[in-house]
């Protein structure tokens, strides 16, 4: 592997295993039982009518329809729904009841159990409980049933939980420009360091979700699981993303310094990793001298952020445990919205927010106490 001429940065093997941040490949793989259960449910929900005789053509169409049905929700959503159903069915077995057909009375008791502190079981937040309910409703629909969330046995219990346990939403700490500069400075000058530098800088400048970062391909339609692709221009890079709110374009301009320019970091990573097709961000060999074929998991982004936050002493005034809890993959996205001193319309477009109110939520944190109405009123 050659050496970089720009910035006198040398590519060298660190010998550090990929496990330091991203763990083993098995950690990134979905639980096989949950995956099999999801496939079974989706397969059962798409089938020929009982009165129609099967044929080769129709059977192939059924398989095609099942594939589209599986792709109707994001992979992370599918995993969450499968885990929700697994947890609920285990709870039903423990209580001596059957999850099918849906019983609003039992679902109401389940929701109450989730909100109550019993033994070592942690109390779930209201948002997590609501997400569990969505998962149950989806699973019942796939099995040909309907869960009426407005039934009084569910709705009144949930309303009481909200009234008694609701708390303001906990937002992850935003990573600011000076933070990201300190974080990338902690990375080694080997192939893995080039990759992680590009991940942090591109994620910050693009205001991207961690799943969007790792789903990027070099070109359009390189892989079936692609979430977007990259085009390079003189002025920067254009990312086309299949995001949570639909397709959107993200413009990442070139920075004022190669040390912190996201486009330069991305170009360096692709050049020295010799990646010209398929996933942009992949695993590295243990000696950090070769780029492998397998796409990184979005978990790597969260681990990378936490690791570099600690190494760079970001918010070093706080205990380590609190710093780890404060920062996550979302901190990159929040950082751009909180830092950019531009019209909110441009920030909203970059982040792909469906409403300006979501963008303003970040900017209100940025602008907190900027205008002192107390002093302005003469007090």
Model-inferred region functions:
Residues 1-100, 109:
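Basic/aromatic DNA-contact patch characteristic of tyrosine site-specific recombinases
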Residues 195-197, 298, 302, 330-334:
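Short, leucine-enriched amphipathic alpha-helices that occur as contiguous helical runs
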Residues 215-271:
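Conserved tyrosine-mediated DNA breakage-rejoining catalytic core shared by Y-recombinases
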Residues 63-76, 86-170, 185-189:
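N-terminal core-binding DNA-recognition domain of tyrosine recombinases/integrases
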Residues 180-210, 214, 262:
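Basic, Lys/Arg- and aromatic-enriched nucleic-acid-binding interface segment
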Residues 244-268, 279-307:
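C-terminal catalytic core of Y-nucleophile DNA break-rejoin enzymes
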Residues 351-378:
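Catalytic-site neighborhood detector that most strongly recognizes the C-terminal catalytic loop/helix
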Residues 2, 201, 331-354:
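C-terminal catalytic core of tyrosine-transesterase DNA break-rejoin enzymes
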């Amino acid at each position: 592997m050659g050496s970089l001429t720009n910035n006198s940065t040398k590519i060298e093997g660190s010998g550090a295993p990929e496990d330091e941040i991203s763990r083993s490949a098995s950690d990134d793989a979905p639980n096989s039982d949950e995956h099999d259960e999801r496939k079974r449910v989706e397969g059962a929900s798409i089938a020929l009518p009982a009165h129609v005789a099967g044929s080769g053509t129709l059977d192939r169409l059924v398989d095609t329809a099942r594939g589209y049905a599986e792709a109707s929700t994001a992979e992370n959503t599918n995993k969450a729904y499968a885990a929700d159903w697994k947890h609920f069915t285990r709870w039903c077995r423990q209580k001596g009841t059957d999850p099918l057909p849906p019983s609003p009375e039992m679902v109401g008791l389940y929701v109450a159990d989730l909100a109550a502190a019993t033994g070592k079981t942690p109390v779930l937040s209201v948002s997590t409980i609501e997400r569990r309910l969505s998962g149950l409703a989806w699973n019942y629909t796939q099995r040909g049933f309907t869960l009426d969330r407005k039934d009084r046995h569910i709705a009144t219990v949930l309303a009481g939980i909200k009234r008694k346990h609701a708390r303001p939403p906990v937002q992850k700490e935003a990573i600011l420009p000076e933070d990201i500069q300190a974080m990338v400075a902690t990375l080694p000058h080997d192939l893995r360091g080039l990759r992680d530098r590009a991940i942090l800088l591109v994620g910050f400048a693009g205001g991207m979700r961690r799943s969007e970062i790792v789903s990027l391909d070099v070109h359009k339609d390189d892989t079936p699981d692609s979430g977007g692709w990259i085009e390079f221009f003189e002025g920067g890079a254009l990312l086309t993303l299949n995001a949570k709110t639909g397709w959107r374009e993200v413009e990442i301009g070139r920075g004022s310094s190669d040390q912190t320019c996201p486009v330069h970091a991305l170009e360096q990573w692709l050049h020295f990793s010799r990646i010209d097709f398929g996933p942009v961000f992949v695993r590295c060999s243990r000696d950090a001298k070769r780029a492998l074929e397998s796409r990184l998991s979005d978990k790597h982004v969260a681990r990378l952020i936490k690791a570099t936050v600690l190494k760079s002493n970001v918010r070093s005034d706080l205990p380590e445990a609190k710093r780890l809890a404060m920062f996550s993959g979302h901190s990159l996205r929040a950082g751009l919205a909180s830092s950019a001193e531009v019209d909110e319309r441009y920030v909203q477009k970059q982040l792909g927010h469906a409403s300006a109110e979501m963008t303003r939520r970040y900017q209100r944190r940025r602008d907190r106490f900027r205008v002192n109405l107390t002093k302005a009123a003469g007090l």
